[in-house]
Curated annotation (Swiss-Prot):
SUPFAM superfamilies: FAD/NAD(P)-binding domain (SSF51905). It catalyses: 2 reduced [2Fe-2S]-[ferredoxin] + NADP(+) + H(+) = 2 oxidized [2Fe-2S]-[ferredoxin] + NADPH. One of its GO terms (molecular function) is ferredoxin-NADP+ reductase activity. Its cofactor is FAD. This is Ferredoxin--NADP reductase. Keywords: FAD, Flavoprotein, NADP, Oxidoreductase. It comes from Mesorhizobium japonicum (strain LMG 29417 / CECT 9101 / MAFF 303099). Pfam families: Pyr_redox_2 (PF07992). PANTHER family: THIOREDOXIN REDUCTASE 1-RELATED-RELATED (PTHR48105). FAD binds at D36, Q44, Y49, V89, F124, D289, T330.
Length: 343
């Protein structure tokens, strides 16, 4: 077979946890190649909410999702990882020597001694709301994520939904948009109480509108919205100005072919041990939101902890028989040389 791409560790998923795995593995001199279904690194952080602030990363009282991705890319730069984007892993085969052969949906073939699954919830796509005639406006004036807040400046914005994303963007985009109308089918929300209270306070100050009901119609031309019809509220059918719309009806998460890899999935999650974060298949590890174990918290912080322990176990597979010496980056000259901070 020709055209095989060989590496020490193949990482499936280039979100924050997959990126930090490169750092921890790199400290042990393991070469990494990352595959992601998106067209860039960062996972959901970069694709769905790049400008959304994150508050629970140690040392960063507040950092945007894209800012975190950028810092991680800077941090792993000394290890020169390889990336393959716009690809889904399709098949996995364990070879006689214990290594793995992974094929993508474009028939690219990778071989690695270790496979790390850091695929979050798998591939995802937003759920389309049941609004008649929405398709021609998608990508032009109807969007399912916020990549740049500036894209909404000066627009009459209608946000539809009752979860955290809907409330967060209602609050964050209110200073930018010309007007903001939040639409939810009932006055109760599935969002953080503090966000709900802030929204109601802003409504009292007439800084935004909240309408109980459902969007049942759109008006516009050539992909550009001009208004939206809301039905079901106490005022009957009303038409509100709308030049931008953000529907938040959740995501459809698909694990894809990984589900067929014999990893004893439970509720679409991969069970792992908490010593090495290894799956039921030796040599395959799962870190981040994709894994499951008692006490699991779906936090980026938890994923960072998991990859630190995973890297030690991966090193024993990649370099069997080699003595592993635990070192601190603060005091180890050899590690500091790898990071490029000393000559």
């Amino acid at each position: 077979m020709t055209g095989i791409i060989s590496t020490d560790v193949l990482i499936v998923g280039a979100g924050p946890v997959g990126l930090f795995a490169v750092f921890e593995l790199g400290l042990f001199d393991m070469k990494c190649h990352l595959i992601d279904i998106l067209d860039k690194p960062g996972g959901q952080c970069a694709e769905l909410y790049p400008e959304k602030p994150i508050y629970d990363i140690p040392g960063w009282p507040s950092i945007s999702a894209q800012g975190l991705v950028d810092k991680l890319l800077e941090q792993i730069h000394p290890f020169k990882p390889d990336f393959t984007y716009n690809r889904m892993v399709s098949s996995l085969e364990k070879l006689e020597d214990g290594s793995f052969r992974v094929t993508t949906d474009e028939n690219e073939v990778f071989e690695a001694k270790v496979v790390v699954i850091a695929a979050g919830g798998g591939s995802f796509q937003p759920k389309r709301p049941p609004i008649p005639g929405i398709e021609p406006y998608e990508g032009k004036s109807v969007f399912y994520s916020v990549r740049r807040m500036e894209d909404f400046r000066g627009h009459d914005l209608v946000i539809v939904g009752g979860g955290d994303s809907a409330l967060d963007w209602t609050l964050n985009l209110q200073p930018v948009a010309k007007s903001v109308t939040l639409v939810h089918r009932r006055p109760e929300f599935r969002a953080a109480p503090d966000s709900v209270n802030k929204m109601y306070a802003m409504q009292e100050m007439k800084q935004l509108e909240f309408r109980v009901g459902q969007v049942t119609g759109l008006t516009g031309a050539d992909g550009q919205l001009s208004s939206a019809t809301i039905k079901g509220g106490p005022d009957g059918d009303i038409e509100v100005p709308c030049t931008r719309m953000l529907p938040f009806f959740g995501l459809t998460m698909k694990l894809g072919p990984i589900a067929e890899w014999g990893l004893n999935l439970h509720e679409n999650l991969i069970p792992v041990d908490t010593e090495k974060f290894q799956t039921s298949v030796p040599g395959i590890f799962a870190v981040g939101d994709i894994n499951s174990y008692p006490g699991k918290l779906k936090l980026i912080l938890s994923g960072f902890h998991e990859v630190a322990l995973m890297a030690q176990a991966a090193k024993r597979i990649v370099s069997p028989g080699e003595r592993i010496v635990f070192q601190y980056t603060t005091s180890s000259t050899s590690l500091q040389k790898k990071l490029g901070v000393v000559g």
